[in-house]
Swiss-Prot record:
Nucleotide-binding found in the keyword field: no
Entry's localization field: Cytoplasm
UniProt gene name: phaE
One Gene Ontology cellular component annotation held by this UniProt entry: cytoplasm
Database matches in InterPro entries: PHA_synth_III_E
Disulfide bonds, paired cysteine numbers: none
Protein name per Swiss-Prot or TrEMBL: Poly(3-hydroxyalkanoate) polymerase subunit PhaE
Keywords, ordered alphabetically: Coiled coil, Cytoplasm, PHB biosynthesis
Subunit comment: Forms a heterodimer with PhaC, which may multimerize in the presence of 3-hydroxybutyryl-CoA. Both subunits are required for PHB synthesis in E.coli and in PHA-negative A.eutrophus.
Biotechnology: Poly(3-hydroxyalkanoic acids) (PHA), of which PHB is among the most common compounds, are prokaryotic intracellular storage compounds with potential uses as renewable, biodegradable thermoplastics. Cyanobacterial PHB synthesis is particularly attractive as cyanobacteria use CO(2) as the carbon source.
Species of the source: Synechocystis sp. (strain ATCC 27184 / PCC 6803 / Kazusa)
Function: When expressed in E.coli with Synechocystis PhaC and C.necator PhaA and PhaB, confers the ability to synthesize up to 13% (w/w) poly(3-hydroxybutyrate) (PHB) depending on the carbon source; all 4 genes are necessary for PHB production. Cell-free in vitro coexpression with PhaE gives a heterodimer able to polymerize 3-hydroxybutyrate-CoA. This subunit has no catalytic activity but enhances the activity of PhaC, the catalytic subunit.
Record has Repeat as a keyword: no
Any coiled-coil regions, as ranges: 298-328
Note: Nitrogen-free medium induces chlorosis in Synechocystis, leading to the degradation of the photosynthetic apparatus and concomitant accumulation of cytoplasmic polyhydroxyalkanoic acid (PHA) granules which in this cyanobacterium are composed of PHB.
Length: 330
């Protein structure tokens, strides 16, 4: 038994050093790309009307970058601990740290939503009594708060929806749908409806990003279990390509199981529907501004393209008939 342990140690030590040295630079370049890449540059040139979406995507990209970085640091630390049997405890520590990051991300999202609703506090005071509002919200939050220690991600989603309903849907949302007066009432109505859809989109996006973060966390846990199992079977990961393959296999299984659940599909469907509604309102506002500037709207351009397409088909058909007539003059 001692000779087996010596052989295992002698094999694993140079192998772990080789793997870490060969992969460190690749990971460093990847983290730099995640921190300085596409989303940050895209925000600088994004139109003002689309500014909020790149900010949300950048926040999500940074969160996933930290998740990847933590997964690599976890494996880097676990590798030399395989011999002394302390790797399972270290895995639990890193998983707990990941769960803490997800909770911090959720708290930040809720704080941002609270700041946005604070801009309309003057309207809320006129429509609702805060004493009744917060008492009802506090009573409704007891059940979701009781689920948090169990690690149920949908408890965070329930709290997010509860706060959004208390701060916006019960008071300011009805004000947005109130009748408008004046010559500019049509344009003002479109702007208010677009703002209402944007608030609902922000809430749905926060829920969907939180769901994705939880799935990433579970995918990381599955990856760590797979790597530990392979190491114990004397089949350690030796190359960066093999590490990517194991990560993809573990993540695919977790994502497939997660998005087969009905409650997760509802969160995703809510986000897609909210995005589509917001884009429709955005298109209506854009067309109204284009009409004011005597510029062709998207609908008019689409009609022109459709007309040109039909004319091209008719010309092609006429040329074909003309060619047949010339070939058979009799």
């Amino acid at each position: 038994m001692e000779s087996t342990n010596k052989t295992w140690t002698e094999l694993m030590t140079p192998l772990s050093q080789f793997w870490l040295e060969s992969s460190s630079q690749a990971w460093k370049n990847w983290f730099d790309l995640m921190a300085k890449g596409g989303a940050g540059a895209m925000m600088g040139s994004a139109p003002q009307s689309f500014e909020s979406l790149p900010q949300q995507f950048l926040q999500s990209q940074q969160f996933y970058g930290e998740l990847l970085k933590l997964s690599f640091e976890a494996w880097q630390s676990l590798w030399p601990k395989l011999d002394n049997g302390s790797a399972p405890g270290a895995v639990q520590g890193y998983l707990k740290q990941l769960q803490t990051q997800i909770e911090q991300y959720t708290a930040t999202t809720q704080a941002l939503q609270g700041d946005m609703d604070g801009l309309w506090q003057c309207y809320i005071k006129e429509v609702q009594r805060f004493s009744q509002l917060w008492l009802s919200t506090w009573q409704s939050s007891v059940a979701p708060l009781g689920k948090l220690p169990t690690g149920d991600i949908h408890a965070w989603l329930d709290l997010n929806n509860l706060y959004g309903d208390a701060l916006y849907n019960k008071n300011l949302s009805s004000f947005m749908r109130s009748p408008l007066l004046g010559p500019s009432r049509e344009m003002n109505g479109k702007l208010l409806r677009a703002f209402d859809d944007w608030v609902k989109l922000s809430q749905a996006m926060a829920d969907y990003q939180l769901l994705e973060a939880d799935i990433q966390y579970r995918g990381f846990a599955a990856l760590m279990e797979d790597l530990l199992a392979r190491a114990k079977e004397d089949k350690p990961v030796k190359t960066w390509k093999e590490f990517q393959q194991r990560w993809a296999i573990a993540a695919d299984q977790v994502f497939e199981e997660a998005f087969c659940e009905e409650k997760n599909l509802k969160v995703r469907g809510k986000f897609i529907n909210a995005l589509n509604r917001y884009r429709i309102q955005q298109q209506e506002i854009l067309e109204a501004w284009l009409k004011m500037l005597n510029l062709p709207t998207r609908s008019e351009v689409d009609e022109i393209h459709q007309t040109i397409y039909q004319l091209r088909k008719e010309v092609k058909s006429l040329k074909k008939r003309l060619g047949e007539t010339e070939a058979n003059p009799g």
